[in-house]
Amino acid sequence: MNELTAFNEQRAEIYWWLSSLLSAELTTEQLEQYGSFEVRTFLSNLAETPELSDSVNALIEKLNAVQGREDAQLELSADFCDAFLGSDKSSALPYASMYLDKSGLLNAKPAQDMREWLTKYNIAQKAEFNEPADHIAIELDFLGNLIVMTNQQASEDEFEAYMNAQLTFINEQLLSWTPRFNEICIERDKFGFYAAVTGLLVTFLKLDVKFLAGE
């Protein structure tokens, strides 16, 4: 494994991690893991990247605050519901269609576009996650898989084509709406844990675009 493929694996893991945070409420066991040495080391290492430092430290601060709550898991689950599962008037709905399609309806063209990406690269949506294809967690899971597929390409030309596909996907399917998604999450997530997650997501996406574009 060379340096670039190893870096790609790290990128995929970060996208999968963010996907898991935005797909469902954290269980008690998962929340306890966020206090572990392994996870805290992962976050500290991530914060060593200057462009990510503020966003990661904001998340660490909220994690520390979560663990000081009396009923941490239940309260954080309520935060997740308030942040993402309400109406478009009260929550930051995690679907591209809500931000990119004038109809304001779920399962609009952005969801169809996402289904086409899944089909093109033969990546299946997880059967147990019964959401429209343009849910943020599905898009991030797809991106992690696309990165891993990039490392499996036999030729330099194919590898480059897959790297370019990642860049196109991030610009068209993610950065086209996640900044606004983050803004609304900041407004509506009163405790701020999930706003810190979406803030880190947008910061990481912007940094990743620079990497993929060779800047």
From Swiss-Prot:
Biological processes, Gene Ontology terms: protein complex oligomerization; protein folding
Cellular localisation: Cytoplasm
Cystine bridges: none
UniProt KW keywords: Chaperone, Cytoplasm
Any one GO CC term of the record: cytoplasm
SUPFAM superfamilies membership: TorD-like
Cited InterPro entries: Chaperone_TorD, DMSO/NO3_reduct_chaperone, HscB_C_sf, TorD-like_sf, TorD/DmsD_chaperones
Assigned protein family: Belongs to the TorD/DmsD family. TorD subfamily.
Function: Involved in the biogenesis of TorA. Acts on TorA before the insertion of the molybdenum cofactor and, as a result, probably favors a conformation of the apoenzyme that is competent for acquiring the cofactor.
Name this protein carries in UniProt: Chaperone protein TorD
Organism of this sequence: Aliivibrio fischeri (strain MJ11)
